Amino acid sequence: MSIVSLLGIKVLNNPAKFTDPYEFEITFECLEPLKNDLEWKLTYVGSSRSLEHDQELDSILVGPVPVGVNKFVFTADPPSAELIPASELVSVTVILLSCSYDGREFVRVGYYVNNEYDSEELRENPPQKVQVDHIVRNILAEKPRVTRFNIVWDNENEADIYPPEQPGVDEEDEAEEEEEEEEEEEEEEEAEDEEEEVEVDVDGEVDLENEDDKTDKIIDGEEAEDDDDGEEIGDEEDEDDEDDEEGDAQTETAAPNDKTTDTEKEVRLHDRDEDEKADSSKKLKTENDTAKEPDTAPTPQDSTN
């Protein structure tokens, strides 16, 4: 933003002779106090083909500039005819009124200037040598061309006041800011969810009593569920105790069976031993009988007799 704004320029002596000075009434506004002066300058364009013929007619320093609207008259000397090509003395040219601050131009106003002879006879039959005394100028003040430029004013070095960039710290700050934003969003979402759960009356008032009743019911329901859970847990504990008692009873009943089984095994072994003894006695008797048979059987000699 420009601190100085050009509000208007008024050309005072127009038309005028070529040799008359230029006079401008300039009005501008200053928004902030300035440390330096404003430099106003008027330039005459001597030739459209080259910048070598441009002439700086005059310059003026205005200051100190107070804050607010300011007005002054800028007077500049006419151009030197000797520095202008003869073929362009009587023609259309341009003058430039510019303003700079601290060597930096921020506004420029251009005007077309028509230079011609003051008599119809000279206009129809121009002399071979230009007669400067008979040349008049007419500035087209109604059609100025204004150009503005952005410059740095007195706050040019404000950037040095700020601390230097610290990449690591800056990244941490950004991360913290992002976390804070996320937390805020989550809190907003939770708040919205809570608002949706609350019932609103027709008039837009919240039915707090119903909410309390609901809360009590919910609490009672939770306590009832807790009681049911406690009963179930107690039943399960009773069942576990019964299962343990049944297991102990089965163990006790199984013990006599084990004893009976051992006794049966001993009886069976005793019977088996008795059977084996009986078998062995039978075998002994058979062997004895077999040994006695030769004594009773007749001999071959007896059979022949």
From Swiss-Prot:
Show the InterPro entries listed in the entry.
ASF1-like (IPR006818), ASF1-like_sf (IPR036747), Hist_deposition_Asf1 (IPR017282)
GO term, biological process aspect, one:
subtelomeric heterochromatin formation
Q: Is the Cytoplasm keyword given for this protein?
A: no
Coiled coil ranges (UniProt) are 168-206
The main location class comes to: nucleus
- Biased segments, Acidic residues type: 168-213, 221-249
Q: Where are the compositionally biased (Basic and acidic residues) regions? A: 259-272, 278-295
Gene Ontology CC annotations of this record: chromosome, telomeric region; cytosol; H3 histone acetyltransferase complex; nucleus
Q: Where in the cell is it found?
A: Nucleus
User: Which Gene Ontology molecular-function terms are recorded?
Assistant: acetyltransferase activator activity; histone binding
Q: Which Gene3D superfamilies match?
A: Histone chaperone ASF1-like
Q: Which domain of life is it from?
A: Eukaryota
According to the record's subunit comment, the protein's assembly and interactions are: Interacts with histone H3 and histone H4.
According to its UniProt record, which protein family does this protein belong to? Belongs to the ASF1 family.
Which PANTHER family does the record associate with it? ANTI-SILENCING PROTEIN 1 (PTHR12040), HISTONE CHAPERONE ASF1 (PTHR12040:SF0)
Briefly state the protein's biological role: Histone chaperone that facilitates histone deposition and histone exchange and removal during nucleosome assembly and disassembly.
The name this protein goes by in its record: Histone chaperone ASF1
Say which species the protein is native to.
Candida glabrata (strain ATCC 2001 / BCRC 20586 / JCM 3761 / NBRC 0622 / NRRL Y-65 / CBS 138) (Yeast)
Write the gene name: ASF1
